[in-house]
Amino acid sequence: MRGDLTFGQSDFNSVDALILSQIVYNNMEGLVPKEFNQKITLAELAERFISTEDFEERCNMGAMINPLTPELLRLAAKSRRFSNVKVCAFINKIDEKALEQFCALTYQIEKDRYVIAFRGTDDTIVGWYEDFNLGYMPEIPAQKDTREYIAGAMAALKGHFILTGHSKGGNLSVFGGMSVPKKSLARLDAVYNFDGPGFFAPVYERPEYKQIKDRIFAFFPEFCVVGMMFEHVNQYKIVKCSADGILQHDPFSWNLMGPEFEAAQGFDEASKIFYSSFNAWANTMTDEERKKFIDSFFSVIYASGAKTNYEIDQNKIICGGKMLAKLAELSEDERKAFKKAIKVFIKVVKDEIPMFTVFKPLVITHH
């Protein structure tokens, strides 16, 4: 991947799309104009970011996001390829009551070409809660935000659009593509999904999906967990990674060959098992049962008093104790359902996601 080539010399590619998806994980609060018609360059953004009084705090990416993410912003901003890219319309909403975590940024890569990047699940528990709500809600709050954001962008900016996102951001990118009205579809060039969760099968039968499916470019790591949640049908590429297990969800571990990703032969056995067990488990429940389960599951997580995975990780014993006490208050059926779900996840997440690993002793069977 060469940072010295402009988009005129080497066209926008999937690696660019992933870089812009990752940059949006940075805390840009108060640094980027909120409007579509006011823009600053990526170089200016990096300068502002580095000069903030709370720079160190902004660089704490929590337990789930690679700590090199601020460095990626700095290096991209220094490169010939990205330094003159303009940014605008940064929005970051976290609403505990509405169970909503939504963040997006628009990049202007050339005169009439824009890339909208959607942030994936961050370190917040509310972000994970909303992810799970994909399991029964026809539309989660972040998807509604996505539709409104894209409509605003297309009304305010002339030209063509590319949508991109990693993790839940990939799901939002595909959802966003489906939300583009027919009259504006000619302005939608591509939709990128990097290891984002899918949808329930009926979504893929909708005309809104069918009319954009050829513009969707999906990429998943060999050991895929997040992307294995719910169904996937479109063509996708599997990427070779330098990390092991669930850590392959982190794009910094994805191998490159020039301007492309290095292809892997297929999915790892463990993630195939997760795909079949997670989706079999999800498909045996009605929407009502799924909602009930998810609410009781997160009532246990929230009992920890933590707002982020990082906080659980830093206070494992205290948080774990509170969560186990809450679990004991659930009915026997709820406890059984809880353990069954945790079992499905623990197999694949091992020690990497604090809100699950606290429960490891519950599900590890001693022979």
Regions found by a protein language model. Name each.
Residues 164-169, 173:
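Gly/Ala-rich beta-loop-alpha elbow adjacent to hydrolase catalytic centers
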Residues 1-114, 118-160, 181-367:
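Alpha/beta hydrolase fold serine-hydrolase catalytic domain that processes acyl esters and thioesters
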Residues 173-182:
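Short glycine-enriched nucleophile-adjacent loop
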